[in-house]
Amino acid sequence: MVSMLTRIRRQIKRVIEPLAKTLAQLKVSANFITMLGLIFAIVYYFEIMRSNTTLGIIFLVFSALMDAIDGEVARVSKTVSPLGSFLDSTLDRIEDILYISAFIFLGFSSYLVAIAVGLSLTISYIRAKAESLGLKMEGRGIIERGERIIFVFVILLLYIIVSKQVSLYLFYLFMLLTAITVIQRFYAVYSLLRK
């Protein structure tokens, strides 16, 4: 399952690179794209809340696409900046909360959804703290942010085309893999800092 998600992520990247170059040539700001990603995430949340799951999925895809493109646009246009990095990192966390907490409106346990949000944020926090200490965390852990977003997409898709129960099983798997990633990253940082 995870290897399949990773392959999907690679295919998405092949689409993103030429799109990012086009946007950079059109002088579209990376920070504007970052803000657009948050707006789409907010719309996604409210559409799921209103039981418009199909429309919610569409806005989830738009939001995830903006998130994938903004950094590439900044790199291609040579406009990488501390402000852009701050905006991207902060708004990504808000989007993560919106993506996962919307599962409450599908009838999932609010307690489990809260735990899933906490685990997801912990993964990101461990990476941020580790990198502030000079450690490299990219690629550490079984399920990174890109895979987590794809998981959210598939859970919603199964909810529509199969059943709530099947999507709930996938949500449980999502929680398990997220918890494993927290442990993997914690152990990796702990091991590196002990040397």
UniProtKB/Swiss-Prot annotation:
Swiss-Prot/TrEMBL cofactor(s): Mn(2+); Mg(2+)
Species name: Saccharolobus solfataricus (strain ATCC 35092 / DSM 1617 / JCM 11322 / P2)
Protein name per UniProt: Archaetidylinositol phosphate synthase
EC number: 2.7.8.39
Transmembrane portions of the chain: 28-48, 54-74, 97-117, 149-169, 170-190
Pfam family, one: CDP-OH_P_transf
The keyword Zinc-finger is annotated on this UniProt entry: no
UniProt: Mg(2+) 2 binding residues: 67, 88, 92
Keyword annotations: Cell membrane, Lipid biosynthesis, Lipid metabolism, Magnesium, Manganese, Membrane, Metal-binding, Phospholipid metabolism, Transferase, Transmembrane, Transmembrane helix
Annotated family: Belongs to the CDP-alcohol phosphatidyltransferase class-I family.
Active site residues according to the UniProt entry: 92
MF (Gene Ontology): magnesium ion binding; phosphotransferase activity, for other substituted phosphate groups
GO biological process, one term: phospholipid biosynthetic process
